[in-house]
From Swiss-Prot:
Residues reported to bind [4Fe-4S] cluster: C251, C270, C280, C320
Cofactor note: Binds 1 [4Fe-4S] cluster.
InterPro entries, A to Z: ATP-dep_Helicase_C, DinG/Rad3-like, DNA/RNA_helicase_DEAH_CS, Helic_SF1/SF2_ATP-bd_DinG/Rad3, Helicase-like_DEXD_c2, P-loop_NTPase, RAD3-like_helicase_DEAD, Rad3/Chl1-like
Keywords associated with the record: ATP-binding, Cell cycle, DNA-binding, Helicase, Hydrolase, Iron, Iron-sulfur, Isomerase, Metal-binding, Nucleotide-binding, Nucleus
Cofactor (UniProt): [4Fe-4S] cluster
Protein name, entry field: ATP-dependent DNA helicase CHL1
Family: Belongs to the DEAD box helicase family. DEAH subfamily. DDX11/CHL1 sub-subfamily.
Subcellular location: Nucleus
An example Gene Ontology biological process: mitotic sister chromatid cohesion
Annotated PROSITE patterns: DEAH_ATP_HELICASE, HELICASE_ATP_BIND_2
Location of the motif DEAH box: 363-366
Species whose genome carries this gene: Scheffersomyces stipitis (strain ATCC 58785 / CBS 6054 / NBRC 10063 / NRRL Y-11545) (Yeast)
Length: 835
């Protein structure tokens, strides 16, 4: 049911009649921004309209702010104003007339801009229709064309001659350099020559960031449903939205796209092409002052476009959308961008994204700390180092005579560094000096060698300036594809970018990070990991007016306060957890502590108990007998799931399960996930048979996959999925937490409790993420079984999402009682559906 944007009961201009919990969430977000909170922590279960609630509350606040602070006669003109035209000597009617004139000018300027956007949008669509490129008033999305394979020659893989900062380039054209510098200065002085010169009088923007491309596209589609009251008079104010993407999403140059295989590569290829004589055909040399790029930036604001539609605009206009859209940043109200751009201060500066005094909204924020950590971490093994050395030697052998001395010397030094790292790992293994999680003193890598003469600072600068990594990677790919099997073993895309990242960490190790030993499947590695993500996030928190963190599974929220912004006072943090939109009787949550008098506790020491594994099988058989349609079972790991299934295959447990429901297993290969899901859904929906899906916490199906309606009538969580306590990451992180606690004056026992709490919270966030997969809309219903006696603990229950916690059966039911209630639950739902 749609409501008018002007009606009092629809304060937030929601496109539909909002549910009570949506109004509560919108109220909480608006209050957080309006009352000066620095941080807002919000949990809203998936399926409750979280994205629209975020959009409506933040945009309503922004329009209110603009109306009161930009387009009001008193805005910015208080008694301290010293302008002679509004002095205390003037009569009040003169002051009012002056203020009205200022506001009128601002409003007229915005009215003109709105009309201009309407005009260019209509012109563009008419031109496209005339050309026969669209068939409706809203252009259907065109499939982006696949890059054609470009013919690449050896010269394409050569870097420019390299000279360090202390070297002088021979025959440097000083006049050319001077002319370039003068041209840049003139650009700054003259500014751009816009068809309509516009400046944004409102310093506040909304930045919406999420983890994946699909989530950002969904945001654009939800935003397109909305319409908000204008902040000024005279014309309807459109929502000015700009999606910021990477070159990989926005590049329209086929040569660049065919040359590049990953994000780092495409950036280097693009910059390299701009420096070349021919340049990029889609990027005007003076693109900052180009009317074509200006028009594309304005067109991008004329209506809500997702990132593919922005790329299509650029293709149709034959102008680079990546560089053009950034010109529209100044006039936007709301900008969407991926985590990687938001969290990089240097990238924000390049794109002219000013978060000062703005609202920063981070969706799916349960991923935020992991994303920050992974962006500033790197891991490298002997095998990878050997592959890098092979690639470097192969490249040098081919181009040795064509490379200048600067490139040759630095590439040989890079080989030397890789050999030193290999030697260091091998010596440490021989001396039994490797203990997973133990810190590495990087100076030990050069011990008893001439490695300290390499000057890794200069080496890192060489890799950064020369952009040689993508040249080598691309050449190795070409040779591997066309000629030489040896090169195939040498090609290890994108390992050269990994050594670049490794060198950056060696050169500038953060005091909040550590180098340490790690091991995966018996393979030793050196790992650098950022241990304190708050140091990176502080830049955003300190600059923004307000930071809103939202997610479907934000509990335990204490983790964010402790590790992401420990410096923010509690009184400046607002937390809010939504209930679910479903009626209270549409979800039951049962802790399952025992079966056949066997206690179910899947702790590390007890998890292989054969009696308990048999009891687990009996429990799942009974659940399959009582629950219709689909059942999803989550195990702590692939290894444990396979172990359990192998035991059940040797007994009759799997036979009993398969007599009730068709069995599916989560594949380890991502390419097989959609096939398994389709078969699972088809069995339930089309064949009208029951099915059971064995999945893994943190696997392919625990996040982003929805088991709505009959696909997930029950979710079974087996045990508490603690991460591997003996992994290098966990050991290093817990040591860091303990050392930080002791530095603050805590006792050793308090410090250990802090690190144990962190470890437990990792587990509970994974639980919340997995069990939230089943309820997707207001009429959905399901049962959650938490199979482990430890779920009876109030400490564990308090770390579950609030909407789950509120529905836990607190009576200590045995399995017979749970199954009786299960049958009653589904019988009632069947009767209600048929009534």
């Amino acid at each position: 049911m749609e409501t008018s944007i002007c009606s009092p009961e629809n304060r937030y201009s929601h496109p539909y009649k909002p549910y009570d919990i949506q109004i509560q969430l919108m109220d909480a977000i608006y209050d957080t921004i309006d009352n000066g909170y620095k941080i807002g922590l919000f949990e809203s279960p998936t399926g409750t309209g979280k994205t629209l609630s975020i959009i409506c509350s933040t945009m309503t606040w922004l329009r209110d702010y603009k109306r009161e602070n930009v387009f009001q006669p008193m805005a910015g003109l208080d008694g301290s104003d010293t302008d002679d035209s509004d002095s205390d000597d003037e009569p009040e009617w003169v002051k009012k007339a002056y203020r009205d004139t200022i506001v009128s000018r601002s409003e007229n300027k915005m009215v003109d801009y709105e009309m201009y956007l309407e005009k260019i949008q209509n012109e563009y669509e008419n031109n496209i229709q005339t050309a026969g490129s669209i068939k409706s008033s809203r252009p259907p999305k065109k499939k982006r064309s696949t890059a054609k394979k470009q013919e690449l020659h050896d010269e394409d893989f050569l870097p420019e001659d390299y000279y360090s900062d202390s070297e002088v380039k021979p025959n440097a054209d000083k006049l050319t350099v001077l002319e370039s510098e003068i041209s840049q200065l003139l650009d700054k002085v003259n500014g751009r020559t816009d068809e309509i010169e516009m400046t944004n009088d409102c310093p506040v923007n909304i930045y919406f960031s999420s983890r994946t491309h699909s989530q950002l596209n969904q945001f654009a589609h939800q935003l397109a449903l909305t319409k908000f009251q204008s902040s000024f008079k005279g014309v309807e104010e459109r929502t000015k939205y700009l999606p910021i993407g990477s070159r990989k999403q926005l590049c329209i140059n086929e040569k660049v796209k065919s040359f590049s295989k990953n994000d780092s590569n495409i950036n280097d290829v693009c910059v390299d092409l701009q420096k070349s004589k021919e340049g990029c055909q889609f990027l005007p040399k003076d693109y900052l002052n180009s009317s074509l790029t200006k028009k594309l930036s304005d067109l991008s604001l004329s209506k809500i476009h997702d990132i593919e539609e922005i790329a299509d605009l650029g293709s149709n206009m034959k102008v680079c959308p990546y560089y053009s859209v950034r010109k529209g940043v100044e006039m936007t109200e709301i900008i969407s961008l991926p985590y990687q751009i938001l969290l990089s201060e240097s990238t924000r500066a390049i794109l002219n994204l000013q978060i000062e005094d703005s609202i920063v909204v981070i969706d799916e924020a349960h991923n935020l700390m992991d994303t920050i950590t992974s962006m500033h971490s790197v891991c490298i093994t002997i095998g990878e180092m050997n592959s890098i050395i092979k690639a470097l030697k192969f490249y040098l052998g081919r181009f040795l005579k064509k490379l200048n001395s600067g490139n040759r010397i630095h590439l040989m030094k890079l080989i030397k560094l890789c050999q030193l790292v290999i030697s260091f790992i091998q010596k440490s293994e021989k001396c039994n000096n490797i203990k997973v999680g133990n810190e590495i003193n990087t100076s030990d890598i050069y011990q008893n060698s001439t490695g300290d003469m390499l000057n890794i600072h200069i080496l890192e600068a060489f890799l950064a300036k020369s952009k040689i990594a993508y040249k080598i990677e691309s050449y190795m790919e070409k040779v591997a594809e066309n000629e030489n099997e040896q090169a195939k073993t040498s090609s290890s895309n994108p390992l050269l970018y990994k050594i670049v990242q490794f060198l950056k960490c060696l050169v500038n190790p953060s005091k909040e990070g550590k180098f340490f030993w790690d091991s995966t499947n018996g393979i030793t590695s050196i790992k650098y990991m950022l241990l304190d993500p708050s140091s990176v996030f502080k830049d955003i928190v300190s600059k923004a007016r307000c930071v809103i963190l939202c997610g479907g599974t934000m509990e335990p929220m204490s983790e964010f306060k402790n590790f992401l912004f420990p410096y923010v006072e509690d009184k400046k943090i607002k937390s809010f957890s939504c209930n679910h939109i479903i009626p209270p009787d549409n979800l039951k949550v049962y802790p399952v502590s025992s079966q056949n008098n066997v206690t179910l506790e899947f702790s590390f020491d007890n998890r292989n108990n054969p009696l308990m594994i048999e009891a687990l099988g009996a429990s799942i058989v009974r659940i399959c007998q009582s629950v219709p349609d689909g059942v999803v079972v989550f195990f702590p790991s692939y290894k444990y799931m396979n172990h359990i299934l192998s035991i059940w295959k040797s007994t009759d447990v799997l036979t009993q399960i398969e007599s009730q429901k068709k069995l599916f297993e989560e594949p380890t290969s991502a390419s097989q996930v959609q096939t398994i899901l389709a078969d699972y859904a088809n069995t339930i929906k089309e064949e009208k048979k029951g099915a059971i899906l064995f999945s893994v916490v943190g696997g392919k199906m625990s996040e982003g996959i929805n088991f709505a309606d009959e696909l997930g009538r029950a979710v079974v969580m087996v045990g508490l999925p603690y991460p591997n306590a003996y992994s290098g990451e966990i050991i290093a992180k817990r040591k860091f937490i303990e050392s930080e606690a002791i530095a603050r004056g805590c006792s050793m026992s308090e410090a250990q409790r802090n690190s144990q709490s962190y470890y437990e919270n990792l587990c509970m966030r994974a639980v919340n993420q997995s069990i939230g997969r089943s309820i997707r809309h207001i009429n959905d219903y399901s049962i959650i079984y938490l199979v482990d006696c430890r779920y009876q603990s109030s400490r564990i229950q308090n770390k579950l999402s609030s909407w789950v916690r509120k529905r836990i059966e607190t009576r200590n039911y045995n399995m017979d009682q749970i199954m009786e209630e299960t049958r009653d639950f589904f019988m009632c739902k069947t009767i209600a559906r048929l009534a």
